[in-house]
Amino acid sequence: MLLAIPSKGRLQEPTLRLLEAVGIKPLASDERALVLPTSWNDVNIIKARPEDIPYLVDSGRIWAGITGHDYIIESGSNVVEVLDLEFGKGKLVVAVPKTSGIKSIDELPPGARVATKFVNIAYNYFAELGKRVRIVRVAGSVEILPQLGIADAILDVMATGTTLEIHGLTPIATVLETSARLIVHPNYVNHELTKKLVTFIKGYYAAQGRKMIFLNVPATKLEDVLSILPAMEAPSVTKLAKGDVYEVFSVVPEDILPDLVMKLKNAGAKDIVVTSIEKLIS
């Protein structure tokens, strides 16, 4: 089945890193190839413009895709957002030149020219406000248009605000917040492949910021150690074959490890081993 991913832009690299982290690795190295087999034999990757991905998934010919929430809303496509992937975060904002003196969306004058590639979002947003504006459709480099006298304002994605600052622009309204989403066609929401992909992505995110800790504990110190050691439910405890010693292991938050290890050591734990977790699947 085909999974559409961004072929360019701010979502491309994070998407590839996420897929590799969950075990979906492209098997073809030719960057010109648009369809690539992967290490999951039931998934092929198709590369497409992020703004086109909602339409491709809506067509039913593509099982799933990764793209921005802003592109999904702009397209009006009949797709299901099954996961917020927590990268590519930004805000779709209306911004004006700092020199305009405009401080809020209410001060934007009637007939103002608003440049954007999010035409449908812009029309709907200003219609809901009851404001009459002229939408100037552009494909890119929208920030420069006010300087060129082609637009009075822009509607575009702001991640850090640096690009707006460079071009002398300031945001006056937030239209929506966006981030990368995993989308599927409605017919595939309950498909086993969708469930598998969602499980592995959630497992990868759940493992972030956690470590697995193993330790050996004499029987006389076991109660003291267990009273210190956090766990998702309860630490696992196994008696070793030799001696009156137990092996204990647990999943713990990474940020408490330095203090936790010293407390465990002082409580009588020894042979402490800390390892990374690739995925944590509940």
Curated annotation (Swiss-Prot):
The keyword ATP-binding applies. Gene3D superfamilies: 3.30.70.120, Periplasmic binding protein-like II. The keyword Cytoplasm applies. Its EC number is 2.4.2.17. It comes from the Archaea. Feedback inhibited by histidine. InterPro entries: ATP-PRT_HisG_long, ATP_PRibTrfase_cat, ATP_PRibTrfase_CS, ATP_PRibTrfase_HisG, HisG_C, N-reg_PII-like_a/b, N-reg_PII/ATP_PRibTrfase_C. One of its GO terms (molecular function) is ATP binding. One of its GO terms (cellular component) is cytoplasm. It is an enzyme of class 2 (transferase). Pathway: Amino-acid biosynthesis; L-histidine biosynthesis; L-histidine from 5-phospho-alpha-D-ribose 1-diphosphate: step 1/9. Catalyzes the condensation of ATP and 5-phosphoribose 1-diphosphate to form N'-(5'-phosphoribosyl)-ATP (PR-ATP). Has a crucial role in the pathway because the rate of histidine biosynthesis seems to be controlled primarily by regulation of HisG enzymatic activity. It comes from Pyrobaculum islandicum (strain DSM 4184 / JCM 9189 / GEO3). PROSITE patterns: ATP_P_PHORIBOSYLTR. Pfam families: HisG, HisG_C. This is ATP phosphoribosyltransferase. It catalyses: 1-(5-phospho-beta-D-ribosyl)-ATP + diphosphate = 5-phospho-alpha-D-ribose 1-diphosphate + ATP. Keywords: Amino-acid biosynthesis, ATP-binding, Cytoplasm, Glycosyltransferase, Histidine biosynthesis, Magnesium, Metal-binding, Nucleotide-binding, Transferase. Its cofactor is Mg(2+). Belongs to the ATP phosphoribosyltransferase family. Long subfamily. GO terms for biological process: L-histidine biosynthetic process. It is found in: Cytoplasm.
